[in-house]
Amino acid sequence: MPKVVLAYSGGLDTSVIIAWLKENYGYEVIAVTADLGQGEELAPLEEKALQSGASKIYIEDLRKEFVEDYIWPTLKAGAIYEGKYLLGTSFARPLIAKKLVEIAEKEGAVAVAHGATGKGNDQVRFELGVKALAPHLKVIAPWREWDIRSREDAIDYAEARGIPVPVTKKSIYSRDRNIWHISHEGGELESPANAASYDMLMLTVPPEKAPDQPTYVEIGFEKGIPVSINGELMDSIGLLEKLNVIGGENGIGIVDMVENRLVGMKSRGVYETPGGAILVYAHRELELLTLDRATLHYKEQIALRYAELVYDGVWFAPLREALDAFVDNTQRTVTGTVKLKLYKGNMMPAGVTSPYSLYDEELSTFGRDEVYNQADAAGFINLFGLPLKVRAMMEKKAGLR
């Protein structure tokens, strides 16, 4: 019997896909779950997958690889999609695709399958990953084939086959969770006119319910990578988990946004990224201290393109690798500590230090002129403004002004 390897989350979509693949393709279904830091959500998945009809399930602990090979490079790049989204779902998909391919080759499978809808970005991210790593594998996307047209239909399908699902018709949210974030879509969020109900939050308290006293936290970085909290060296997983707790308690990292999907439509989601928001803010503060103006400004342009690549699922591509090389070069001096003040959803710098600081107090303050002769500024301004002067003279001569 041919085998298919399914990216299995245990949620509504992939729960019904197991039965659907067996009924419509006659395949043996092997479920693969990537442990990216979902926590307690993973506990019932083995039993659930087997009860749903899978022949076996792999639950792979990919947390370390996820943080160090996917999150940290994106953090160093400063990549943020459309100024708000910290890419928590986006950079998880290429890693899942990579693991699907590895297990498909190990099992001798002829196909891989996923539960992404035909309207979303994830179908692109999964399938680009497979095309880049194993173009010979068939990819099955049930949402593009079956007669199920809504989550309500999927619930009916599951209930008719005795498949347990974690949602009801009255409370339907589509969620994606990993060690970096949790996303919420669906329900009242489908209308941008509706205020989000913060009852949905799982990692973060609403800012108004955060402590009335500020919390201070100090992050240590080595070459752009976070390595310590309040002076304590920590492994990557422990560091991010601890910052999630600290940020969550202080209402940090809640984003409600309407974004432009790759497939051409807009969508709305609420994202919780408490630890990630702290790291992005702290990393930026350290770069402001340690990078020269030209490099910093050019890197901002790179960050926009990097964010698009990650969002679009083009992770396994020469351009992303080339951009990583540029970013890594810029991070050689991004070493130091950043102290932040957290208060009711807000962050403020409370002290930044680095052995590679480019801030020179003698140059920056109004002290003596031995180091910086202010009279030199006149010549600089004359030369810097020369193109403006020449154009103004031309316009006057030509009667344009």
From Swiss-Prot:
One of its GO terms (molecular function) is argininosuccinate synthase activity. Pfam families: Arginosuc_syn_C, Arginosuc_synth. It is an enzyme of class 6 (ligase). One of its GO terms (cellular component) is cytoplasm. Pathway: Amino-acid biosynthesis; L-arginine biosynthesis; L-arginine from L-ornithine and carbamoyl phosphate: step 2/3. Its main location: cytoplasm. Keywords: Amino-acid biosynthesis, Arginine biosynthesis, ATP-binding, Cytoplasm, Ligase, Nucleotide-binding. L-aspartate binds at T117, N121, D122. It catalyses: L-citrulline + L-aspartate + ATP = 2-(N(omega)-L-arginino)succinate + AMP + diphosphate + H(+). This is Argininosuccinate synthase. It comes from Desulforamulus reducens (strain ATCC BAA-1160 / DSM 100696 / MI-1). The gene is argG.
